[in-house]
Amino acid sequence: MTLNSSHTDAGGLSHSIAVYTGSFDPVTLGHLHIIERASKLFDTLVVGIGINADKKSLFNPEERIELVQTISNHLPNVRVQTFDGLAVDFVRSLGAGVMVRGIRPLTDIAGEFTMMMANRQLDADIETVFLMADERFAHVSSSLLKQIAALSENDDHLAKFVPRPIIPSLRAKLAAPSV
C-alpha cells in the first residue's frame, strides 16, 4: 500500500488525507518544503493554521491563509484553513487519518514525540508522520526571520528563508507601528 492510496481505517478516517498544522506566522521556505513533500505523499493535504488567542501573532488568521495559499497555489491537492482547539480534533473533523509534522533540529524530536504520544492517547486512529526538515531550512524560525527582516533591508537575505511572495507582507507588518 502506498501512502496516497485511499485507505480508510476502522474509525472511518482516510489515510489519503493528511493535515499539516502550525502557526505559519510567517510561513517559511521550510514550511513550503514540507508542504510540497507531503502533497506528494497524500491525495489531499490540508494546511491547518492554528489560532491561539493567547499568543501574539504577527499576521492575523486571514492573512496567514492568504500567504500560505499564495505559496502553495501550484499544488492542486493542498487546501488551507484555520482551526482553534486541539489539532487532533481538527484532523478528525476533516476525516483525515494522518498528521504531518516537520522536524527541524534534533531538539524538536522530544517535543514532537511528546505531542504525538498525547495525540495518540486522545485519538489512536490518527497516525503522525514525521518529515525531516531539509538541512537548508533546519535552523529557520519565525524569531530568526523577524530579526533578519528588522536588521537588514536586503530582500535577498530574507529570500534565503521565506518565499519571495511573502517578503512584501513581512516587511509591511514589521514596519507597522503596532509590531
Swiss-Prot record:
Q: Which residues of the sequence carry a binding annotation for substrate?
A: S23, K55, A87, R101
Cofactor(s) the record lists: Mg(2+)
The enzyme's E.C. designation = 2.7.7.3
Give the pathway listed in the UniProt entry for this protein. Answer: Cofactor biosynthesis; coenzyme A biosynthesis; CoA from (R)-pantothenate: step 4/5
Which family does this protein fall into?
A: Belongs to the bacterial CoaD family.
Its biological purpose is as follows: Reversibly transfers an adenylyl group from ATP to 4'-phosphopantetheine, yielding dephospho-CoA (dPCoA) and pyrophosphate.
What this protein is called in its record is: Phosphopantetheine adenylyltransferase
